[in-house]
Amino acid sequence: MHPKKLLNAKQISTILYRLSYQLIEDHNDFSDTVIIAIQPRGIILAKRIIEILNNEYSDIKFGLLDVTFFRDDFRRTEKVLKANETKLDFSIENKTVVLIDDVLYTGRSIRAALDAIQSYGRPKAVQLLNLIDRRFSRELPIQPDYCGIHVDSRLNQKVKVCWRENDGEDSVYLFKNKE
């Protein structure tokens, strides 16, 4: 199976605007909402969303969350893990936290993020925004509140989100794991 392009740059842009306006509808002026990107794959998506939101709201609190050592599988590898930066320069106490990650697959990264976020306070609510929801691959009962598209895929397939900042183009591909 050759890689199948699921989304091109124009489609991704349209989805990002839709997701941003859904956030605006639900969170008004963002005074009680913080946006947190899950390291590393959620950063570019979150920054793109923030860029759109900043056209109307300039004081949105934005942070980065590393979940490396909160994952339930981090001890199952021989290689040394490298943690990413967690940067939360604000309180999440009694705020609505919108977690952002590129692909929701098994739900394990989100479970780890929920554990990690508790170290920083008790949010009023936690919501999830994903560009891609691989909905039939879930191992945990986790669903996105905001979703770009649903992708039905097999276990031997992988979804890759490409960003122009890292990969030279905005696109999403579906391919077999070995490709």
What residues fall within each predicted segment?
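Residues at the starts of beta-strands that form the adenosine-phosphate
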Residues: 32, 61, 96, 125-128
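Internal catalytic-core helix/loop-beta-alpha segment
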Residues: 88-120
